[in-house]
């Protein structure tokens, strides 16, 4: 499937007998827009003054890597999940990372992102562009097993990232709100187990951190 995508980028594609001509200039522009998400900091972390927060691209990358962990017995299309993860926030290359705190309602957010993803997909040949649009709309619709998996990836990456910031900055339980926001929302059993393990490690870190702090304070007061 990756070969067919690369081939379409190189030679163009046909849909309903219509050939869309694209140029290497379009490809450079496409890659420039993709590059925007490599620099775009995720709004949720910025608003909470997290030092050196992750970018949108790094978030999507780890979501895509989760596709390698799809259980072997699963009927999920792993390549499709990986592609969907890599494009689900691609519209943010143009509109930015819009969150509920930005003062923009959901309908307007969807309108802006829909316009942006069409602009981005127009820079690649028809077959590739159609696939980008289809995957984007499928994710937004949340009606397929793959879309539900990728949404779970989105939620899971966020809470693992929150825990990693807690450890890096030595602020146990500081980002509890992110865990609360995902509680009861995971669908796939795989992620239920992942969240259980993550919470276990987070509690252990909190307990160990507290014990070390109490020991340090006791030594200082002696």
What are these regions (language model features)?
Residues 2-222:
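Alpha-helical, largely C-terminal catalytic domains
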């Amino acid at each position: 499937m990756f070969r067919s995508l690369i081939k379409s980028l190189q030679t163009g594609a046909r849909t309903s007998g219509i050939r869309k001509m694209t140029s290497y200039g379009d490809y450079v522009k496409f890659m420039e827009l993709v590059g925007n998400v490599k620099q775009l900091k995720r709004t949720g972390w910025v608003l909470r003054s997290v030092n050196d927060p992750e970018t949108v691209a790094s978030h999507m990358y780890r979501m895509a890597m989760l596709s390698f962990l799809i259980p072997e017995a699963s009927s999920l299309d792993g390549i499709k999940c990986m592609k969907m993860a890599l494009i689900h926030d691609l519209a943010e290359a143009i509109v930015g990372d819009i969150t509920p705190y930005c003062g923009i309602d959901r309908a307007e957010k969807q309108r802006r992102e829909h316009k942006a993803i069409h602009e981005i997909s127009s820079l690649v040949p028809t077959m590739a562009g159609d696939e980008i649009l289809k995957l984007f709309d499928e994710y937004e619709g949340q009606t397929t097993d793959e879309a539900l998996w990728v949404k779970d990836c989105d939620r899971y990456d966020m809470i693992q990232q929150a825990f990693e910031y807690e450890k890096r900055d030595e602020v146990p339980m500081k980002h509890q709100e992110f865990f609360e926001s995902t509680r009861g929302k995971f669908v796939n059993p795989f992620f239920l187990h992942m969240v259980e393990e993550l919470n276990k490690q987070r509690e252990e870190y909190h307990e160990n951190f507290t014990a070390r702090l109490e020991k340090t304070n006791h030594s200082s007061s002696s």
